């Protein structure tokens, strides 16, 4: 047995009973014990009173091993999956590790090359997945009867008894989400295929090409000549065109690393990867010989930490936090902010606040925008809408009234201020409108010709001078301003009636902005309606195409609301074609999941009135970290 093999086995034995973050790839180096200085500390109590010698087939005897740890001899297998959809393949991977459900694990994402971090995004883009693997399991280590395990007192005492995002995030970072109860050691040679929605290759052909490639890789046949023969056969027999992604032997097409290669062509991606053994081996048969000398952990089995916390105060809150973390996978450094924003959200005004009964005289109660000579007027609700002091996480236009001809602006916000950010939101509010911005008249754009009403498209953002006047000699990074209210106004500028936007800003102390992103709706292919709209577009917003809110019929919706895409609108309403009613919201599914609104602008896209919303991430200044 090589020294490397002995080290891996010793690490594998010590990993049993440790914590693990299921969002990570299944590697021994990612095991968690809660304390980096104590490398052999476990999260669960194992019987150490009757330690014994553990015989591992092919590797000899290991001393002083808990009697709760057993070892079984492994085997060499060839596994071929069917061509499955995203959720079924994810569920299969979870079953291999004794994990319930279909939420993708880090191992699943690493195997198929998913890097977006968004379950909904990946599932929406993928048509099908397949796998062909040659697996050499040298032995299996496992804890006897894992369902009777008990967490150590230090882990039980670390469970927060209340909803404290900082403490909950610290627990997950230190201990992970699951406890390792089994480790399989050996090597695996895997080829996987990922088919995107853009590919029209049917499942039977995809399966045929996958299995054919697996045979060539794992049987030791002459790979290059066989591949050329198959391509010639397809051409000569008028078969469907051979998918170039499966030509993994062409160095010009394939990107290769140590134990990993990837080839992506025409919506099909083929990934070949080895774990364990010598990655420099030229063939599969040569690689097999090296597995006993260089083994690695190829699969883990787990039990959820929360299943061992049934009698611990706060276990339900921790379970909820872990469920959110596994579902949306925010970065660990943002986890406490993500949990801070994970509470319920509401719209202002709520539907109960909208007027019912006999409507007032529109002409006298509300100003109107004239769109054309013969068409209907678009009345404007100029009542200010506020979220009190709750951070705003989204906006939309809404058509009120019996005839749906009264334009209003609605705000989505967190439903309470009992958050880390909420504790620092002050009572200092400042209103700022597009009419207050210098040279705002340069951004007047007509709704439907110069003779009709106009829209002021200048972006409304906080004034940097506010920080200088309110910081009280502190660092300017100690103060941020967020949107907590909005109002539409119609003002006369000479003979023009112009629609303006006002925003209410609220001061947040001890916080600073770390990232900004402008988001707009899916109207058209261009968001610029004129030269002034182009001039007012933020240069720091990045690629506008990537920040569009897409309405894809294949999108995986994780929102359980009755109308997650917004309330229904009468299909035949004549006003709808002039107003974009998209909901511009960012929630937990938009990594890292704690966006809030800091700016808005009105703009026109092909004659349609739209919103363009600036979202930002806030971090707390001088965040205290307890020991």
Swiss-Prot record:
It comes from Arabidopsis thaliana (Mouse-ear cress). One of its GO terms (biological process) is plant-type hypersensitive response. Keywords: Hypersensitive response, Immunity, Innate immunity, Plant defense. SMART domains: MACPF (SM00457). Residues 1-339 form the MACPF domain. This is MACPF domain-containing protein At1g14780. It comes from the Eukaryota. Pfam families: MACPF (PF01823). Negatively controls the salicylic acid (SA)-mediated pathway of programmed cell death in plant immunity. Belongs to the complement C6/C7/C8/C9 (TC 1.C.39) family. InterPro entries: CAD1/NSL1-like, MACPF.
């Amino acid at each position: 047995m090589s020294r490397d093999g002995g080290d891996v086995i010793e690490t594998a034995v010590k990993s049993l009973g440790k914590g693990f973050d299921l969002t990570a790839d299944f590697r021994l180096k990612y095991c968690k014990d809660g304390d980096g200085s104590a490398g052999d500390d476990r999260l669960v109590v194992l019987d150490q009173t009757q330690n014994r010698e553990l015989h591992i087939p092919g590797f000899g005897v290991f001393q002083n091993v808990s009697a709760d740890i057993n070892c079984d001899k492994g085997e060499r297998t060839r596994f071929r999956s069917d061509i499955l959809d995203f959720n079924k393949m994810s569920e299969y991977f979870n079953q291999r590790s004794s994990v319930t459900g279909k939420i993708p694990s880090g191992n699943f994402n690493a195997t198929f090359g998913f890097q977006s971090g968004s379950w909904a995004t990946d599932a929406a883009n993928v048509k099908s997945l397949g796998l062909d693997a040659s697996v050499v399991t040298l032995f299996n280590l496992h804890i006897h009867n894992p369902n009777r395990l008990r967490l150590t007192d230090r882990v039980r005492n670390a469970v927060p008894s209340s909803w404290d995002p900082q403490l909950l995030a610290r627990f997950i970072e230190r201990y992970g989400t699951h406890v390792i109860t089994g480790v399989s050691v050996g090597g695996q040679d895997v080829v996987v295929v990922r088919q995107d929605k853009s590919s029209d290759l049917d499942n039977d052909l995809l399966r045929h090409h996958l299995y054919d490639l697996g045979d060539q890789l794992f049987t030791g046949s002459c790979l290059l000549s066989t591949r050329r023969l198959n391509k010639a056969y397809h051409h000569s027999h008028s078969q469907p065109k051979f998918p170039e992604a499966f030509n993994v032997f062409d160095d010009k097409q394939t990107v290769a690393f140590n134990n990993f290669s990837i080839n992506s062509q025409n919506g099909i991606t083929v990934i070949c990867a080895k774990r364990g053994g010598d990655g420099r081996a030229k063939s599969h048969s040569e690689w097999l010989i090296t597995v006993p000398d260089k083994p690695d952990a190829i699969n883990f089995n787990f039990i959820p930490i929360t299943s061992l916390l049934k009698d611990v105060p706060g276990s339900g809150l921790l379970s909820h936090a872990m469920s959110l973390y596994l579902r949306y996978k925010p970065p660990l450094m943002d986890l406490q902010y993500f949990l801070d924003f994970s509470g319920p959200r509401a719209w202002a005004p709520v539907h109960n606040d909208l007027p019912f009964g006999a409507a007032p005289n529109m002409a006298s109660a509300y100003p109107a925008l004239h769109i054309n000579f013969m068409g209907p007027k678009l009345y404007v609700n100029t009542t200010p809408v506020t979220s009190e002091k709750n951070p705003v996480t989204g906006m939309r236009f809404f058509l009120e009234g019996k005839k749906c001809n009264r334009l209003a602006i609605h705000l989505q916000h967190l439903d309470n201020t009992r958050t880390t950010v909420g504790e620092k939101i002050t009572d200092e509010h400042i209103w700022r409108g597009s009419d207050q911005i210098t040279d705002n008249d340069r951004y007047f754009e007509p709704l439907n010709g110069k003779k009709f009403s106009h829209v002021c498209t200048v972006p409304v953002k906080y004034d940097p001078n506010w920080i200088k006047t309110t910081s009280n000699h502190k660092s300017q990074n100690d103060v941020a301003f967020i949107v907590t209210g909005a109002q539409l106004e119609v003002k006369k500028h000479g003979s023009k009636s112009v629609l303006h936007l006002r925003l209410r800003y609220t001061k947040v102390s001890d916080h600073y902005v770390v990232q900004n992103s402008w988001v707009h709706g899916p109207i058209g292919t261009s968001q610029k309606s004129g030269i002034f709209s182009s001039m007012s577009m933020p240069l720091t917003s990045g690629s506008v195409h990537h920040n569009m809110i897409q309405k894809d019929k294949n999108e995986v919706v994780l929102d359980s609301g009755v109308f997650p895409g917004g309330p229904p609108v009468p299909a035949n309403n004549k006003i709808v074609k002039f107003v974009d009613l998209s909901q511009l919201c960012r929630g937990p599914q938009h990594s890292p999941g704690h966006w809030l609104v800091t700016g808005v602008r009105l703009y026109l896209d092909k004659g349609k009135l739209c919103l363009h919303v600036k979202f930002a991430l806030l971090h707390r200044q001088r965040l205290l970290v307890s020991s």
